[in-house]
Amino acid sequence: MNLDVGELSTRQLAEKGISKAQLEDRDRSVDLGVEASMRKPYGIISAQALHDVGGASEGTELRLNYQYFWQIDPRLSLIPNVGVEWLSDKRANYYYGILNSEVARGVDAYRPDQVFIPHVSLGANYVINEKVNVFGVAMQKFLPNKVQDGPLVDQSSQTNFYMAVNYKF
């Protein structure tokens, strides 16, 4: 996670009485964690625990996911996924709240504290040949009211796209 102040809407911040000069970028977290998963005929259930060891938020995130692999043909698989993320107070306040240094610059204090963020995604994997495959994901996160009510967020959801090319040596 990270937040680049330059990407925020100047107009929407102004409507909330904030200027970009009062805000700080949020550093990208460096997470260390563990994952456990259970594969069954009806899909995969997985849980992850992450902690920011890089010192950005020093917060924790827990994730719970369910996904199913749907083999369309020998080369193409679709992977629907549904899950939820829990962000600790430190993590949620760092990325979605107002920092103490920003309060000192005149921004009203705001801390959402811990939040749950549900999401859905659809992934696809296409095997090009024995050594190369392409993988992509579209994910939609549904931001809770505690996040939407903050001055840094002006939307009810967040969409992300990922793509990767894998090569087997």
Describe each PLM feature range.
Residues 62, 78, 118, 132, ...:
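Hydrophobic core residues within well-ordered beta-strands of beta-rich domains
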Residues 1-65, 71-79, 89-112, 153:
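Outer-membrane pore/translocation modules
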Residues 66, 156-169:
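Outer-membrane beta-barrel "beta-signal"
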Residues 30, 60, 116-118, 140, ...:
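Transmembrane beta-barrel architecture of outer-membrane proteins
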Residues 98-146:
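Glycine/small-residue-rich hydrophobic helix-like segments
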Residues 37-42, 70-74, 86-88, 126-130, ...:
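Outer-membrane beta-barrel strand-turn architecture
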Residues 148-156:
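Short, flexible active-site recognition loops that position polar ligands and cofactors
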